[in-house]
């Protein structure tokens, strides 16, 4: 099943007939594979690890699938006839994607942008740098818009540092330097949930620790500030978050293993601690299901004397799930928005 933006692209396949195509920020479908019906070859870069997993099983000699904030070094200088960008949910990320696309186009190369009507794509003309021609709307279908532009002059060389902000953050463990890549949400201050978590960290945390949904690495950096002996693994599905986490660790002269994982699927072994401000707060049924799976998998992945501590929106129904899988619910702190759950075996 193709998403609406992908269906809109298929309607406009005439723009990439027999082209070598780069697809940036693709969605959780197999459009890039179906694109081979029209294109000569396709290279796809996902910024969401789940989207990458959806497509990677279809990879072949004419379809290359990658995950990350940019293509591998071996493809850094590769040019394509056309670059397709799916308009991102985080609007500021579009500027980065436009410059990234330009690195892989020759002058006069074609840029195709697709996005949902209500997703911000109508502002594309204001967002497009002057090294592209003015984007022209080519189609309005499936509640989506399709624009085409061309590279009219060479773009500045992309430096990821130009798309990363760094700031000092005060935490209960001390001052940290936090790096935020574009597209990663940050208030540039400690949010209520993370503040509650860091204010009540267990002092007996030891060994191998998992930071689930690490974001920019605030929790990991605070943990290592308090206890440099910890062996921490940081996982997320967002490429820009993983990049942010790596840069945050470097800025604080800290080390941890940072890698993508779809839930616990890419993780091996058990942990002495799982500490998290998990990324499910909206209360939707699908989100609640993911949260339930998180608790269930946490119980499996925790060592016999492990520590599990998470902070979550107080309205989310964690208590019943925690009782089912851990046997006891301990709320060690709370405020008007969040609850802090702790389980020590």
Swiss-Prot record:
Per its record, the protein catalyses: guanosine(1207) in 16S rRNA + S-adenosyl-L-methionine = N(2)-methylguanosine(1207) in 16S rRNA + S-adenosyl-L-homocysteine + H(+)
Coiled coil regions in record? none
> Which Gene Ontology terms of cellular component type are present?
cytoplasm
| Protein's job | Specifically methylates the guanine in position 1207 of 16S rRNA in the 30S particle.
Domain of life the protein comes from:
Bacteria
Q: Which family does it belong to?
A: Belongs to the methyltransferase superfamily. RsmC family.
Localization per record: Cytoplasm
Protein name as it appears in the record = Ribosomal RNA small subunit methyltransferase C
Name the Enzyme Commission number(s) assigned to this protein: 2.1.1.172
Species the sequence originates in? Shewanella frigidimarina (strain NCIMB 400)
Q: Name the InterPro entries for this protein.
A: DNA_methylase_N6_adenine_CS (IPR002052), Mtase_sm_N (IPR013675), rRNA_ssu_MeTfrase_C (IPR023543), RsmC/RlmG (IPR046977), SAM-dependent_MTases_sf (IPR029063), Small_mtfrase_dom (IPR007848)
Write the record's keywords in alphabetical order, separated by commas: Cytoplasm, Methyltransferase, rRNA processing, S-adenosyl-L-methionine, Transferase
What would be an example GO MF term here? nucleic acid binding
Its subunit composition reads: Monomer.
